[in-house]
UniProtKB/Swiss-Prot annotation:
It comes from the Bacteria. GO terms for molecular function: DNA binding. Residues 26-45 bind DNA. It comes from Sinorhizobium fredii (strain NBRC 101917 / NGR234). InterPro entries: Cro/C1-type_HTH (IPR001387), Lambda_DNA-bd_dom_sf (IPR010982), Tscrpt_reg_HipB-like (IPR017507). Residues 15-69 form the HTH cro/C1-type domain. Keywords: DNA-binding, Plasmid, Transcription, Transcription regulation. Disulfide bonds: none annotated. PROSITE patterns: HTH_CROC1. This is Uncharacterized HTH-type transcriptional regulator y4mF. Coiled coil: none annotated. CDD domains: HTH_XRE.
Amino acid sequence: MAKRIKTPADIGALVRIVRKEQNLRQDELAGVAGVGLRFIVDLEAGKPTAQIGKVLQVLQTLGCSIDILAPGERRK
């Protein structure tokens, strides 16, 4: 599922959707991702100041990846 991300809230919504698809509770995701429960709660709420390293850690744990396109590039 490719999803265009424009805001922290978009990332949070994606994390919530994928977490639920994997039948994980927030505390379970926090444990396997190596972050705190509060971080997952804040991330899913779209907190704009979430630490990028931890965000990437959570996304990787869920099996998600990020592709960043430079201006003028197109998706393949």
